[in-house]
């Protein structure tokens, strides 16, 4: 957050410098007649290119403008025709060239600092999201917390020889349900699912919502032989759901579970094994 504040100060300073320099340049150019408006239009174009696309584009436009104007000035002087006196034209071209280079640099820095602020904001939002450990709908922990708890459970199993099973429920037709009934009804559905799961497993079992359509449960001190009874109970609790309008819909899930094994060392390995060896039983 300290870095972002420093970048904000830099952005304010560059904007202030740009406004001050542009004001002085406009005052200087206002003394010109017909060419003054054209000079200002091109100058604003260079500044816009720098702010929107970065310093490289602004410098490229500046070099092209200076090259074209220098060529035209030489051409008109050679042809005995001049838009304005040679000495005045050269002075104007030099001043304008310096101003364009300055504006290119300042507008380019504004572009770079703004881009960095956007990246910092994106990172900050991602960090905040990762620190919000509890899903607002179900009250279950999120994916980051799930990995942390699973790692701790693996360590306890290695140290004390405990057994546990990780159970994953993947709801069928989640996207279709949300599209048909809306986000409010979907939140209500998962509030119901969360309540039913709480009544079906022990309080000491750890519940997670790693993604919108998935529920994960760490069944502590549970051998694999007990899983058929657990699945039967869950099937009974999650068989149907009553919509807010009073109608009932059937719920089905893909189910996979994996008991702890000695060859699994990390939570990532455990979850990868769970996905690869998914036993697709339909509740």
Curated annotation (Swiss-Prot):
Question: NCBIfam families of this UniProt entry?
Answer: GGDEF
The record lists the membrane-crossing segments as 11-31, 35-55, 56-76, 93-113
Where can this protein be found? Cell membrane
Question: Quick one: which gene encodes this?
Answer: ydaK
Q: Which superkingdom heads the taxonomic lineage of this protein's source?
A: Bacteria
Provide the protein name: Uncharacterized membrane protein YdaK
Q: Which GO terms describe its cellular component?
A: plasma membrane
Q: Which InterPro entries match?
A: GGDEF_dom, Nucleotide_cyclase, Rev_trsase/Diguanyl_cyclase
Q: How does it sit in the membrane?
A: Multi-pass membrane protein
Q: What is its main location?
A: membrane
| Keywords associated with the record | Cell membrane, Membrane, Transmembrane, Transmembrane helix
Pinpoint the GGDEF domain residues: 162-283
Q: What organism is the protein native to?
A: Bacillus subtilis (strain 168)
Family annotation (PROSITE patterns): GGDEF
Question: What Pfam family is a match for this entry?
Answer: GGDEF
